[in-house]
Amino acid sequence: MKNYLYVFLISMVPLIELRGAIPVAYGIKAAMANPEEFSLLWAYIVIAIGNMLPVPFIFFFARRVLEWGKDKKIIWKFFTWCLEKGHKGGEKLQEKAGRGLYVALLLFVGIPLPGTGAWTGTLAASFLDMDFKKSMLAVIGGVALAGIIVGVLCTLGFGAIFGIN
């Protein structure tokens, strides 16, 4: 149970998210004396939930908090960086997507590259004032897509090295 909590918490961390938690789950399984005690399927479910849990809060509150903190003495650099990242993500989505904005959001979140996860995608959707329900569906789809891609890559890598599948 403790290992599921680890991957759950890791999946909630910005910039790491699901993309980092899935390889950790594979590593946990590889390091266990009795790997049958740790189900990768349950780990995927726990990781996806952990990755999605902060998303509604990010959509509704992150932009306000970041705007508030951008002129505060100690935190302004980090908050300004986050605001710029959200603006840039939103601009990229809008430039490349045109009318297919929600499909672009799904792909933005779903292609596992650094800085393109659920946190950044949701922040970009918030900055673009996109519809909440449609954005959440796109982000959920993107998280599922990223999970499949990272899972396949981990299965190939860890399977070849440790015999895990």
PLM regions: where:
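Membrane-interfacial helix-loop-helix
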Residues: 1-9, 28-107, 133-134, 140, ...
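Transmembrane helix boundary and interhelical junction motifs in multipass membrane proteins
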Residues: 12-25, 112-123
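Hydrophobic transmembrane alpha-helices of multi-pass small-molecule transporters
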Residues: 18, 55, 147-151
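Alpha-helical structural context
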Residues: 27-28, 110, 127
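Transmembrane helix interruption/hinge and helix-loop junction motifs
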Residues: 37, 113-115, 130
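Interfacial loop-to-transmembrane junctions
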Residues: 125-148
